[in-house]
């Protein structure tokens, strides 16, 4: 954040995670999870993402307040926090989702094929990284 300020960078896009919500089923009417769902991470990964979101939000607000006090334009300071989900599943037709027609090339559909008996085993090439 200091480097952003030093180099006159005032916009940041952060790849966060939906894990910041934690167990959304603890609240009524929160599935599917709306953006106004209260934050409540339940693991270290989610807490880390939530903490970074807080740091970004605090920094953007501090810079805006500083510039406002100096009677300078402050609106150019922005932060975007993108909370991704890792959805899996498939449309029953197999046209889209994790049950592709033909040979799958992604890990999740390959694992699904092993689990359902469509494939005997999962081959890992190299060291698996």
For the regions a language model picked out, list residue spans one by one.
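Proteins with a high burden of low-complexity, intrinsically disordered sequence enriched in S/T/G/P/A and R
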Residues: 1-6, 128-129
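Alpha-helical segments that scaffold the active site and NAD(P)H-binding pocket
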Residues: 2-3, 57-62, 112, 116
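Catalytic helix-loop patch of NAD(P)-dependent Rossmann-fold dehydrogenases
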Residues: 6, 11, 20, 25-86, ...
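Residue(s) in the substrate-gating loop at a strand-loop-helix junction
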Residues: 17
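Alpha-helical substrate-binding/gating segment
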Residues: 87-90, 109-129
């Amino acid at each position: 954040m200091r480097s952003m300020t030093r180099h006159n960078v005032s916009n940041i896009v952060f790849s966060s995670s939906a894990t910041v919500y934690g167990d959304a089923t603890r609240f009524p009417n929160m599935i599917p999870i709306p953006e106004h769902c209260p934050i409540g991470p339940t693991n270290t990964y989610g807490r880390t993402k939530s903490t970074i979101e807080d740091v970004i939000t605090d920094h953007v607000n501090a810079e805006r307040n500083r510039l406002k006090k100096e009677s300078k334009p402050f609106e150019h300071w922005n932060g975007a926090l993108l909370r991704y989900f890792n959805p899996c599943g498939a449309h029953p037709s197999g046209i889209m989702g994790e049950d592709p027609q033909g040979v799958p090339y992604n890990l999740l559909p390959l694992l699904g094929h092993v689990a359902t008996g469509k494939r005997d085993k999962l081959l890992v090439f190299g060291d698996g990284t």
